[in-house]
Amino acid sequence: EACPAGAVKLGQKLCDKEGCEITYPQMPLPGNQPWGEHMWSHNYRDVNRINCYDTGTAPCKTACPAHIGIQGYLQLAKEGRYEDALALIKKDNPLPAVCGHVCNRRCEDACTRGTIDEAVAIDEVKRFIAERDLNAETRFIPKKTIPSLKGGFEEKIAIIGAGPAGLSCAYFLALTGYKPTIFEKNAEPGGMLRYGIPSYKLEKDLLAAEIDVIRQLGVEIRCGVEVGKDVTIEDLREQGYKGFYAAIGCQRGRKPGISGENAEGAYTAVDFLRKAGAKESFALEGDVVVVGGGNVAIDAARISSRCIDAKISMFCLEAREKMPASNEEIEEALEEGIELNCGW
């Protein structure tokens, strides 16, 4: 087995009795081999998730769904260049503070430091950088890069839905010189970020602050307008809109297909969390049972404990160590007195 840094093992012999050097397996280091196009890998995101030498892409960045320049912003943060670090993050992620609260940290799962002791706290650093800016007197507004000598574009673009996808689409369009309009049927923008994630996990003021930055780029958000009901695509075409992006999300709960799933008091987790997030009036009576072992199930259980003083029980198929929920979420649920029943 070769060490990627060319090191020898403790107690490994380097010479024989005659004093001659003993060769041992060594992995070629990137600095010792010529670099050229023959070393490139155009499919690095699919085939290169451990060793980053062939492409120069670290495992953390490869594992990140947003493909953020993680090594770069960590180095900039180390140097105290927080605004530069935020600018680098926002090249790929328009909502870094939100992500810092709800990200499942695939980057940290792939971090090779974790093979020694613990992974680098990548998500916490991103969260610190983003929240530091939101709490400042003057917030960082990304610089636009308009691919036209004439300035911004006049074409009107309509985006249907102000959830993460719609906000991201508007953000990147605005950075290239467009002034898109988002049509949102709910009273507030954010989609499942606002109506599906409990406030104890994601503060709504923080979400609103990051959306305000997107507005400052020239994005218009019209809430309380349901496309297809209050206005149609044809109506928007007549108003001069040339492009459309449907970001309506997937906000319907999934039922397990068992008897009693439509009984009174039975909710899908998505519907339940939306009602709680929208502060709609609904009553919980008696003990609460949550079926599932993922993070959404834990969200439903923990928000239930805040709605009613009763026994909250979770039932899931998986063993404790196989539960889809993160260990952090599980531990916090247990600390709040939620009963966990595995292997059902």
What are these regions (language model features)?
Residues 258-272:
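A short, gly/pro- and small-residue-rich
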Residues 144-195, 201, 240-249:
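Compact, aliphatic and Gly/Pro-tolerant "microcore" segments centered on a short helix or tight beta-hairpin
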Residues 159-183, 223-237, 252-254, 271-327:
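Rossmann-like dinucleotide/flavin-binding elements
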Residues 1-153, 204, 244-262, 338:
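Ferredoxin-type iron-sulfur electron-transfer modules and their immediate structural context
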